[in-house]
């Protein structure tokens, strides 16, 4: 038999397990991952810059930046329309678009910019989406969004879905609301983390030669993950509105 302190120490180690090296900020008594906030601010600044450049001089004959902005808006509008239909998609375009562009920007920032070359006194910079806290937060926001969608349309009648088609399925229907954010968060986190770890290992073995194609694959995979996350978010909202 193992002593009780073996189990307690094991679970403590698992709870404290971290990926990468972090530096922390103490904000109102809470320790937050500072490297996540730094890169998030960088990505948000870039997205804001692109938005300003794309809408600064709107003309009937668009310039290159306006073309870029219009293409991005058309793309996220198509995602929302395909999942939500003509009746509901317009009000959800800002939310779906924000999810897609934020995840897209974070994934590309992690795939293109060599953050690990930036030396810090403590910790290291990386894509925000390779931190489980970021992906869980995005998944929980999505859960709040589809609960809001269902309640705003059906009121408390929305909860009837938990006993449909038969009341026997109540536990399964409740469990589904927990598995949705779990699958969203761990899918995004796992793919981004796997890509960064692969590049790190290959760079240490064969610098420049092998990592370049892997980086290109990471850029593609990051784009696909942003599309999958936003599409699933729109699909969950559409399901709540049915």
Curated annotation (Swiss-Prot):
GO molecular function: proton-transporting ATP synthase activity, rotational mechanism
Alphabetical list of CDD domains matching this protein: ATP-synt_Fo_a_6
Location(s) in or outside the cell: Plastid, Chloroplast thylakoid membrane
Stretches of the chain forming a coiled coil according to its record: none
Family matches, as SUPFAM superfamilies: F1F0 ATP synthase subunit A
Keywords: ATP synthesis, CF(0), Chloroplast, Hydrogen ion transport, Ion transport, Membrane, Plastid, Thylakoid, Transmembrane, Transmembrane helix, Transport
Membrane topology, record value: Multi-pass membrane protein
InterPro entries from the UniProt entry: ATP_syn_F0_a_bact/chloroplast, ATP_synth_F0_asu, ATP_synth_F0_asu_AS, F0_ATP_A_sf
Transmembrane region(s): 34-54, 93-113, 132-152, 188-210, 222-242
Pfam family, one: ATP-synt_A
Keyword Membrane: yes
Cysteines paired by S-S bonds: none
Any one cellular-component term (Gene Ontology): chloroplast thylakoid membrane
Family under the similarity heading: Belongs to the ATPase A chain family.
Quaternary structure, from the entry: F-type ATPases have 2 components, CF(1) - the catalytic core - and CF(0) - the membrane proton channel. CF(1) has five subunits: alpha(3), beta(3), gamma(1), delta(1), epsilon(1). CF(0) has four main subunits: a, b, b' and c.
Function description: Key component of the proton channel; it plays a direct role in the translocation of protons across the membrane.
Name of protein: ATP synthase subunit a, chloroplastic
Gene, per the UniProt record: atpI
């Amino acid at each position: 038999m193992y002593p009780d302190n073996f189990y307690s120490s094991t679970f403590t180690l698992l709870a404290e397990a971290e990926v990468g090296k972090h530096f922390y900020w103490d904000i109102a008594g809470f320790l937050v991952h500072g490297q996540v906030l730094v890169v998030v601010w960088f990505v948000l600044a870039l997205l804001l810059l692109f938005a300003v450049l794309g809408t600064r001089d709107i003309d009937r004959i668009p310039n290159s930046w306006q073309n870029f902005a219009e293409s991005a808006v058309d793309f996220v509008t198509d995602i929302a329309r395909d999942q939500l239909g003509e009746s509901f998609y317009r009000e959800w375009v800002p939310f779906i678009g924000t999810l897609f562009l934020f995840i897209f920007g974070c994934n590309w920032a992690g795939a293109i910019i060599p953050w690990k070359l930036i030396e810090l006194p403590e910790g290291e910079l990386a894509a925000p989406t390779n931190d489980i806290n970021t992906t869980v937060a995005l998944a929980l926001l999505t859960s709040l969004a589809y609960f809001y969608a269902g309640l705003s349309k059906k009121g408390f009648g929305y909860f009837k879905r938990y006993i449909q088609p038969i009341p026997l399925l109540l536990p399964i229907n409740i469990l589904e609301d927990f598995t949705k954010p779990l699958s969203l968060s761990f899918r995004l986190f796992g793919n981004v983390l796997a890509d960064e770890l692969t590049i790190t290992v290959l760079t240490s073995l064969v610098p420049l030669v092998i990592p370049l194609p892997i980086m290109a694959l990471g850029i593609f995979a990051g784009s696909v993950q942003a599309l999958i996350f936003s599409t699933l978010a729109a699909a969950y909202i559409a399901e709540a509105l049915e």
